[in-house]
């Protein structure tokens, strides 16, 4: 067969861009006849400067088989409209690529579009140019299956959203992709509120139009959920091709002096002695919660590295920032009493930190990329979900898979939609940290074994390599 090409359209935030780029690299390494173009939409307003730097680095590394089409800035609407407003530019870019392919006798043939889970309106572009459309799902199979299940129940009139607060509900759901009953109070806001549910229902319906779904997971991590999805008979084939992690140039973390100081300090600590607390680019806390965390860390007696940021007042307009004076916020004398045991920082080079032998546990917001990074480096986690699907991730990691330590079972609020969270007490946090840092716990041993499987999945003959090959085979079947 002759050369063929895929066009990727990722959602324009850093985490999604990174996993898309990593998957594209794996695909072109796997198949020499394949070339990939990645269309990069204007970044969402408020995304940090590191995303711009990352895109610049990608563009500079473009070549004949993997290159990037960066769409220049336009208006910055709300998140929900961002992709839709740029559809005309996506159409023009795809048309240009098709035209470029047709002009060269040795050029590849367009075999399909691969769109992000939040770029489903691009399906219409694929239909217009008469090529298949594939989905790239940047989170896990479990939450994918949950969303599809709820969409199916809703369309059968077997699911509705109550006017009462779902976080107070005692109802549990029987979800085919889970072995454990799933509490309604653990639902992501998008699947449990009248404001957001229509968007996710539409998303689920359009997912079913895809020729296939690439998922950033690996078969050994979610075997039950994958089998459930495959056996349902009414969803496209899922290809578990992860973990898709951007580790290159990050494991040393020495891009600036601050990062270097952090890593040098970690090099001086005993193995598995430091608990690392970090909550992603959107995670932040108010003063009261920060004090409870400080009390817990001091009482636990463990060494710590704490990435602490002030919660954003309006996440649509600004990301979390730094506290002006931590000594006024945290308990009196905290820094003097813990100066030999811990560090409180702002930004943290997360991948480089997790790679250090000194890290013995990770308190995380439970974003999917962070979970995969912790598994890659064999670091057990204690979930502290803050927004989006993270409550589901926390439930699965603790209750379903036994790969995480519980701080508390139920969490309230969502920082993305601005709903109030409940203060987690110092006692709860301290108890969670002590369990997390146990050196021979069942959770730590399970994480160690899963880490080995995580690495094996990406090697020749591994499950994710096999899934990539199967995806490429299926793509070539649909080339007209």
From Swiss-Prot:
This is UDP-glycosyltransferase 71B8. It comes from the Eukaryota. One of its GO terms (molecular function) is quercetin 3-O-glucosyltransferase activity. The keyword Transferase applies. Keywords: Glycosyltransferase, Transferase. Possesses low quercetin 3-O-glucosyltransferase and 4'-O-glucosyltransferase activities in vitro. It holds the Pfam family UDPGT. Transmembrane segments: none annotated. Belongs to the UDP-glycosyltransferase family. Its EC number is 2.4.1.-. UDP-alpha-D-glucose binds at residues 281, 348-350, 365-373, 387-390. It comes from Arabidopsis thaliana. It is an enzyme of class 2 (transferase). Gene3D superfamilies: Glycogen Phosphorylase B. SUPFAM superfamilies: UDP-Glycosyltransferase/glycogen phosphorylase (SSF53756).
